[in-house]
UniProtKB/Swiss-Prot annotation:
GO terms classed as biological process: pyruvate biosynthetic process; ubiquinone biosynthetic process
UniProt KW Nucleotide-binding keyword: no
Cellular component GO terms, alphabetical: cytosol
Pathway membership: Cofactor biosynthesis; ubiquinone biosynthesis
Keyword Disulfide bond: no
UniProt-listed SUPFAM superfamilies: Chorismate lyase-like
Keywords: Cytoplasm, Lyase, Pyruvate, Ubiquinone biosynthesis
GO molecular function terms attached to this record: chorismate lyase activity
Protein name (record): Probable chorismate pyruvate-lyase
Family listed: Belongs to the UbiC family.
Main location: cytoplasm
Subcellular location: Cytoplasm
Species per Swiss-Prot/TrEMBL record: Nitrosomonas eutropha (strain DSM 101675 / C91 / Nm57)
Length: 178
């Protein structure tokens, strides 16, 4: 048995480059942090539909493979350059509960909603170096001119009224220019 199975997410981004580790470890709103580091910030929605979760999301969300979730994917852009690919999933039944406004966010930041509601609790961050075979790597690279060898990502659960949403943020190469 391997010590670090390929699906594993880790509590510390040990092998991440030092200049990226600062972004990865930031505990507050990534939206606010990006807004502070660029002149023009915007959220570009690219995908939102009911689908099945990625295989490494099933356990953390207490899902079965056939369960439907709302998948929302956006690029966070600084000065029109994509710097983060954000992917969130929430159980379909929770769209009628705690997360009922999620499907209508459009180009508004999910982070703004998550960090302004004092009832929302966040679990500790988990980290992973995504390789080309990971589905989020593939989707994150769609708007990149050159595909990197790997991409670092972080994720955590945000819980409102015992109903979780899993938010994964994939850091794109342009983050190094901020």
């Amino acid at each position: 048995m391997k010590a670090n199975p390929p699906l594993a997410w880790h509590p510390v981004p040990v092998s991440a480059p030092v200049n990226l580790r600062w972004w990865l470890m930031h505990q507050e709103s990534l939206t606010r942090l990006l807004q502070a580091h660029c002149e023009h910030f915007r959220v570009e929605p690219v995908f939102q539909t009911l689908a099945t979760a990625c295989i490494d999301e099933l356990e953390v969300m207490n899902l079965r493979r056939q369960n439907q979730v709302l998948v929302r994917e956006v690029y966070l852009r600084c000065n029109e350059t994509p710097v983060v690919f954000a992917h969130s999933i929430v159980k379909k039944e929770h769209l009628r509960g705690a997360w009922r406004g999620l499907s209508r966010l459009g180009n508004r930041s999910l982070g703004t909603m998550l960090f302004t509601n004092p009832l929302i609790q966040r679990t500790p961050l988990a980290f992973k170096k995504l390789k080309p075979h990971h589905p989020l790597f593939e989707r994150a690279c769609k708007q990149l001119q050159m595909r990197p060898i790997n991409l670092w990502a972080r994720r955590s659960l945000f819980i409102l009224l015992r109903q979780p949403i899993l938010v994964t943020e994939v850091f794109l190469p342009a983050i190094h220019q901020l």
